[in-house]
Amino acid sequence: MRDQFICLALLLCALHSACGLYFHISETERKCFIEEVPDETTVIVNYKVELYDPRSNGFMPSSPGIGMHVEVRDSDDKIILSRVYSSQGRISFTSHTPGEHVICMYSNSTAWFSGAQLRVHLDIQVGEHAIDYANVAQKEKLTELQLRIRQLLDQVEQITKEQNYQRYREERFRHTSESTNSRVLWWSLAQTLVLVCMGFWQMRHLKSFFEAKKLV
């Protein structure tokens, strides 16, 4: 029983959705990331911008004048967030439709020299992994056991959302497949009808030709 509980806990931990990375961008470059998010799910984006210093051949904290323009589009290509933030920040939004959400970032400054680079550290957290449980425990005065139960309940809720999202994707795929199969069927029938009509026309044409030549 204990081994089963450990396996379940490991499985739940594996289902955390988070990614941490960094990337380089130039002054006019735009970087976008696609995150598949179930509906009614919180997404947290943490970022930090560093400016390349040619004297030290490394990256240093960027000046206050350099910020990042962040734009988020949902699966319907609607803008749900678009604004300029400082060189370091934390962005939060909640999805209202399931599907691919596109997070785009680019610099809002043209003050730095051409050829310079920015390094952007990015960490995207989705679902219950985005919840600050230390803050929750402090606000709600939860014991360690109560906090752990809260975490497990949130994980189960996130798993349910993921399952619903997978069913939604399967339904969309099935609808697309059925629509494609229907179009292929009607196109095949149309081709067959055209061939039959052409064959009938050729037969009549040949018959008229033979009758004109008095061969039949």
From Swiss-Prot:
Where the protein is mainly located, per its record?
endoplasmic reticulum
Record-annotated GOLD domain positions: 30-126
Superkingdom of this entry's organism? Eukaryota
Tell me the compartments it is located in: Endoplasmic reticulum membrane
Q: Which residues lie on this side of the membrane: Cytoplasmic?
A: 204-216
Q: Which Pfam families match?
A: EMP24_GP25L (PF01105)
Species in which this protein is naturally found: Drosophila pseudoobscura pseudoobscura (Fruit fly)
Q: What is this protein called?
A: Transmembrane emp24 domain-containing protein eca
Which segment of the chain is annotated as a signal peptide?
Answer: 1-20
Which GO cellular component terms, listed alphabetically, does the Swiss-Prot or TrEMBL entry include?
Answer: endoplasmic reticulum membrane
Q: Which residues form a coiled coil?
A: 134-164
Tell me yes or no: is Membrane among this UniProt entry's keywords. yes
Which family, according to UniProt?
Belongs to the EMP24/GP25L family.
Write down the membrane topology.
Answer: Single-pass type I membrane protein
